[in-house]
Structure formats: structure tokens, C-alpha cells
Amino acid sequence: MRGYIANIEKLTLENENFRKVLYTAKHSQLVLISIKPGEDIGEEVHKLDQFLRIESGAGRAVLDGVTHEIADGSAIVVPAGTKHNI
């Protein structure tokens, strides 16, 4: 099958793994990440843009040193080359 179709909200809420790859293509990858209270992903920089969606909970996204409050339903676009942590 080409592409990927699924109930991403259901899969995300059921995910208990820190990182779970659902789909990988030539120019994109779909990954679920579950972060426990008090944890973070660690500061990262990527060569490609990233899109993140917060399915539940609240926290902070730090992009190039600027902190943003995030919560259930938040969408975050991290441009390529941006230092970030969630």
C-alpha cells in the first residue's frame, strides 16, 4: 500500500512507548512519542522540517531558546535547523 491511513488520535492515546515509528517514506516519517510528566525529548536539530501535534497533556516547546506553552490540540512546526526541545 502507498501512503498511510489510520486513526492517529487513537494510536497516540494508546501508545506507551517513548518512540514508535508508524510509517517511513523517502521524505517523511510518522512517529508517535509519549513523554511522561517531567520528561523531555532532549534538545535536537534536524535537517528537515518537523510537524508535531500534542494529543493530551500540557508542557513547553522550546524553539531556538524561545519557550512556548503547549497543551492538548497544539500544533508545532519546527523548521529545519532549529534547536528544539519538548
Language-model segments: residues:
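A short, N-terminal "cap"/entry segment at the start of jelly-roll beta-barrel domains
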Residues: 1-27, 62, 77
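Conserved short histidine dyad/triad with adjacent acidic residue
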Residues: 15-16, 31-46
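A generic "binding-loop/recognition-motif" signal
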Residues: 28, 37, 47, 66, ...
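Glycine- and acidic-residue-biased ligand/ion/polar-headgroup-sensing regions
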Residues: 49-60, 64
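Short acidic-glycine-tyrosine-enriched beta hairpin
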Residues: 65-80
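Ligand-binding loop in jelly-roll beta-barrel domains
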Residues: 80-86
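Short, surface-exposed secondary-structure edge patches
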Residues: 32, 42, 51, 66-68
